[in-house]
Amino acid sequence: MLAKRLVPCLDVKDGKVVKGVQFRNHEIVGDIVPLAARYAEEGADELVFYDITASAHERVVDKSWVSRVAEQIDIPFCVAGGIKTISQARELLAFGADKISINSPALTDPSLISRLQDEFGRQCIVIGIDSFFDASSNSYKVKQFTGDEAATKDTQWFTQDWVEEVQKRGCGEIVLNVMNQDGVRGGYDIKQLSLVRAICDVPLIASGGAGAMAHFRDVFIEAKVDAALAASVFHKAIINIGELKAYLAAEGIAIRR
């Protein structure tokens, strides 16, 4: 059995790490490099950095902090934010990122996924999907430009359909960001993640809702995800990554130690 991964997420805005609730009302929680170093030391398996306003503001992630992070940590990390071209992706990988993630740009131009995969290989192409449960239609729908509340918009895609589409186009991993659960610490959306797991043949990373150690156990066992991403519980020191790994190992979950 492949070991499950724990992935702290650092949302970046104006050069600082921020955290919101349901993708709104972001507050500053710290500086990028010290937080990254702390999580690496605690035992994180990898890190994800989202420049949350890059796509909405028509720019690409700031490469200066990417290189500083690469100098300070020795675990893999992924960066996202406004990546729309092969050359932009190449620059970020050259600055030290191990993977690049695309979200809104892929919705604008789905062929970008295939072109990135052809150039760099499936293993370093991650697709982020911001999924919102629409109670009025009892369906999961994909949102775009979610890093800026004023710019957020609906798309034509239902979540399950987009999951299948990005796999056909060559993505290597999928991060499912469950917007309704984001930042509220009520647990991962096991139902939605299980539906996606059933149609997802690439590694699936759960995102949105972690509030207790048991939530990580439940999402690994019940939704069978490959990795669990979390932010506020780590930023606010509610959960220590090393202690979480010990807990999960005691619960019989294969975890990297």
Curated annotation (Swiss-Prot):
EC code(s) of this entry: 4.3.2.10
Family the entry assigns: Belongs to the HisA/HisF family.
PANTHER family: IMIDAZOLE GLYCEROL PHOSPHATE SYNTHASE HISHF, IMIDAZOLE GLYCEROL PHOSPHATE SYNTHASE SUBUNIT HISF/H IGP SYNTHASE SUBUNIT HISF/H
Signal peptide: none
CDD domains documented for this protein: HisF
Subunit and partners: Heterodimer of HisH and HisF.
Organism field: Shewanella putrefaciens (strain CN-32 / ATCC BAA-453)
Pfam family, one: His_biosynth
Taxonomic lineage: Bacteria, Pseudomonadati, Pseudomonadota, Gammaproteobacteria, Alteromonadales
GO biological process, one term: L-histidine biosynthetic process
NCBIfam families tied to this protein: hisF (TIGR00735)
Entry-linked SUPFAM superfamilies: Ribulose-phoshate binding barrel (SSF51366)
Summary of the function given for this chain in its UniProt record: IGPS catalyzes the conversion of PRFAR and glutamine to IGP, AICAR and glutamate. The HisF subunit catalyzes the cyclization activity that produces IGP and AICAR from PRFAR using the ammonia provided by the HisH subunit.
Principal location class: cytoplasm
GO molecular function, one term: imidazoleglycerol-phosphate synthase activity
Protein name as annotated: Imidazole glycerol phosphate synthase subunit HisF
